[in-house]
């Protein structure tokens, strides 16, 4: 099934004929298969591991270094993330480079005009399926300084670092704050700990600083989150392993504690699949007596999922908006 963005692109198939093509940005479907027959070559790059891991021909990472005669960028809802990815890629190509930018109107794709106007000619060439399609030709190669995109803030004795579109990138959110308040020195936490959906690394770094003897693993699907967590650990002189994983897809070991402020937003829609998989599979990923501890908006239907997977659960902290759940293997 094609996304709305790709449906619009199918109206312009002649543009892809006999050219090397790069698809990157928020690619979520197999539009590549639609154009392979007539294109010279098709490459796909994604910063989202949940998508990239499904297909052998999709490259995953933070920096896209793939060159092509025509690039197609799928706009994301986060303007700064788009700016980061577009300028990073355009900084390494030549004047005359052609690009198409496609995105939903509700995701703010219109702002690409102001973003790219300083670097070349941009024009809207189609509007359909509540999306806008733009053609861009590079006239002035931009300078890309990734350091300018980093945000940081102080959390007690920690410095937290984050790239665009990473959760808790500007300040500590209320849910994570409540979750962290449930840990104290008296717990004497030890063993293997997994911070799943680590974002900027707030939870994992906080626990590692508080409980030095734990063996910490941090995981996320977003390349920007993984880089942010690595940076947070390094800048605070903390040890930990950071891995790309779609829930447990790339994690084989068992843990004594799995802790998470799991996401329930997917782009500009709400999605629960990752959380459902986390709760359903966590018991098999815990050592005997191990614990799953998560925080969530109070209205979300997690108690039933926890009881189904673990047999029971406890609410160990709550506020007007959030609840912290604990379930033990």
Swiss-Prot record:
It is found in: Cytoplasm. Its EC number is 2.1.1.172. InterPro entries: DNA_methylase_N6_adenine_CS (IPR002052), Mtase_sm_N (IPR013675), rRNA_ssu_MeTfrase_C (IPR023543), RsmC/RlmG (IPR046977), SAM-dependent_MTases_sf (IPR029063), Small_mtfrase_dom (IPR007848). GO terms for cellular component: cytoplasm. Coiled coil: none annotated. The keyword Nucleus does not apply. It is an enzyme of class 2 (transferase). It holds the Pfam family MTS_N. Belongs to the methyltransferase superfamily. RsmC family. Monomer. This is Ribosomal RNA small subunit methyltransferase C. It comes from Actinobacillus pleuropneumoniae serotype 3 (strain JL03). The lineage of its organism: Bacteria, Pseudomonadati, Pseudomonadota, Gammaproteobacteria, Pasteurellales. The gene is rsmC.
């Amino acid at each position: 099934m094609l996304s709305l963005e790709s449906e619009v692109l199918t109206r312009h198939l002649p543009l892809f004929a006999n050219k090397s093509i790069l698809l990157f940005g928020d690619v979520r479907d197999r539009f590549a298969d639609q154009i392979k027959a007539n294109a010279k070559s098709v490459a796909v790059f994604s910063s989202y591991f949940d998508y990239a891991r499904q297909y052998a021909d999709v490259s995953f990472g933070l920096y896209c270094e793939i060159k092509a005669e025509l690039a197609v960028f799928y706009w994301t809802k986060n303007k700064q993330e788009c700016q980061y990815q577009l300028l990073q890629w355009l900084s390494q190509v030549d004047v005359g480079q052609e690009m198409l930018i496609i995105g939903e109107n509700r995701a703010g794709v219109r702002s690409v005009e102001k973003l790219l106007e300083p670097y070349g000619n941009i024009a809207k060439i189609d509007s359909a399926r509540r999306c806008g399609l733009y053609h861009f030709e590079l006239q002035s190669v931009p300078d890309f300084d990734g350091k300018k995109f980093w945000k940081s803030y102080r959390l007690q004795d920690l410095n937290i670092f984050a790239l665009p579109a990473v959760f808790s990138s500007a300040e500590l959110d209320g849910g994570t704050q409540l979750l962290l308040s449930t840990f104290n020195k008296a717990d004497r936490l030890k063993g293997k700990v997994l911070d799943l959906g680590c974002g900027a690394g707030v939870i994992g770094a906080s626990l590692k600083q508080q409980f030095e003897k734990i063996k910490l693993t941090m995981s996320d699907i977003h390349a920007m989150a993984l880089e942010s967590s690595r940076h947070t650990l390094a800048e605070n002189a903390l040890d930990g392993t950071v891995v790309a994983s779609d829930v447990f897809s790339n994690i084989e070991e068992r843990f004594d504690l799995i802790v998470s402020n799991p996401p329930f937003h997917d782009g500009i829609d709400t999605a629960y699949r990752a959380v459902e998989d986390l709760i359903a599979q966590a018991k098999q990923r815990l050592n005997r007596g191990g614990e799953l501890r998560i925080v969530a908006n109070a209205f979300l239907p997690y108690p039933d999922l926890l009881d189904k997977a673990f047999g029971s659960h406890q609410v160990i902290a709550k506020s007007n908006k959030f609840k912290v759940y604990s379930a033990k293997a």
